[in-house]
């Protein structure tokens, strides 16, 4: 789990939640006013885990702020449960904080209404019925929401709920985890937000297949140090290679990444292999200034190391539907196989944050963002 999310998982006081938000943004007078308001509006309400309810919207706003610093989007995250869980109305929200915020809060309230009407909550429901209901919910959700900012706040809301899922009964944990995989993960994927997608997948995986999760987690913990040492050596060699061939030290970044648990599990299931046979448990990621630099770096790497041609993929020339662009290559060095991902810094922002990396606004209005085109 991402260290940032691990820290948020431990926060259980209003003061602690506000401190986390302050680490991400300078809290404006408008947002301070909204924080004071939601603390009062949700007074006397507590989550199943015992903390004051307003801790939740503040932490949802904290997660949201990593994708957008837009004041109205963060305000929406803070207010996302007000209409549903307190006596205050959308008209009140619009009068106090404007139509842009009230429209987004309305979208989030609509999501809650759709879920309430369509999703099965009985603990006796079969897995098949739960999945079918979740698929229906996803279709209706996508059809009814035309602002991607609403979906991103909802994804952040779901992530915080997943972080605190342990306090619920086991049958509810599994139902919510399955709903997360069927409804929210595909939306995060189509919006290109790998940061949210990967966290949601692993949290859901933990509750749906705990034994399989533990096996993968134990293997990674047992082997991570040795594998990391091997990759550190390879990173140093690759960095030296690129710097010798014209790349400046301060214009490139090279680091390793570990494949997340659910992705490992899917590859094992799809290919019928053991975890030891998954070639890309670890990979190195090379960030360079421009598209052409990606190909320059690739050329130098293929001249230095023998490539495994069958595993080469050029997602720059042919991007994924969600906008993902990266060159994937696999090479041999010292009788070991190393996966390498090469992308520009801009491509990395899109890969991590998806549509949120290139939101464009003019006078508070969205420019050319259509959820139906992206997801439908």
PLM region spans:
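Active-site helical microenvironments for divalent-metal-assisted chemistry
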Residues: 1-338, 343-376
């Amino acid at each position: 789990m991402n260290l940032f999310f691990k820290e948020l998982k431990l926060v259980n006081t209003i003061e602690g939640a506000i401190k986390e938000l302050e680490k991400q943004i300078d809290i404006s007078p408008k947002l301070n006013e909204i924080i004071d308001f939601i603390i009062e509006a949700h007074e006397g309400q507590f989550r199943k885990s015992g903390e004051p309810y307003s801790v939740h919207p503040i932490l949802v706003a904290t997660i949201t702020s990593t994708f957008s610093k837009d004041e109205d989007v963060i305000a929406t995250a803070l207010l996302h449960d007000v209409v549903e869980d307190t006596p205050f109305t959308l008209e009140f929200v619009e009068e106090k904080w404007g139509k842009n915020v009230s429209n987004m809060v309305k979208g989030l309230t609509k999501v809650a209404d759709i879920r309430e009407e369509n999703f099965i909550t009985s603990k006796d429901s079969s897995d098949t019925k739960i999945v079918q209901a979740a698929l229906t919910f996803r279709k209706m959700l996508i059809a009814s929401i035309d602002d991607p900012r609403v979906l991103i706040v909802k994804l952040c809301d779901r992530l915080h709920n997943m972080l605190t899922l342990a306090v619920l009964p086991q049958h509810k944990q599994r139902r919510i985890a399955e709903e997360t995989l069927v409804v929210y993960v595909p939306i995060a994927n189509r919006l290109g937000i790998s940061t949210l997608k990967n966290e949601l997948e692993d949290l859901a995986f933990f509750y749906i297949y705990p034994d399989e999760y533990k096996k993968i987690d134990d293997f990674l913990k047992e082997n991570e140090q040795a594998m990391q040492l091997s990759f550190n050596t390879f990173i140093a060699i690759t960095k030296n290679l690129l710097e010798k061939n014209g790349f400046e030290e301060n214009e490139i970044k090279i680091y390793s990444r570990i494949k997340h648990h659910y992705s490992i599990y899917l590859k094992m299931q799809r290919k019928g292999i053991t975890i030891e046979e998954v070639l890309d448990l670890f990979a190195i990621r090379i960030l360079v200034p421009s598209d052409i630099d990606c190909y320059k770096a690739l050329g130098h790497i293929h001249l230095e190391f023998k490539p495994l041609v069958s595993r080469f993929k050029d997602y720059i020339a042919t991007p994924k539907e969600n906008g993902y662009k990266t060159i994937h290559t696999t090479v041999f060095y010292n009788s070991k196989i190393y996966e390498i991902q090469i992308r520009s810094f801009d491509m990395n922002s899109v890969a991590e944050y998806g549509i949120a990396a290139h939101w464009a606004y003019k006078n508070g209005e969205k420019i050319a963002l259509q959820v139906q085109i992206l997801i439908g």
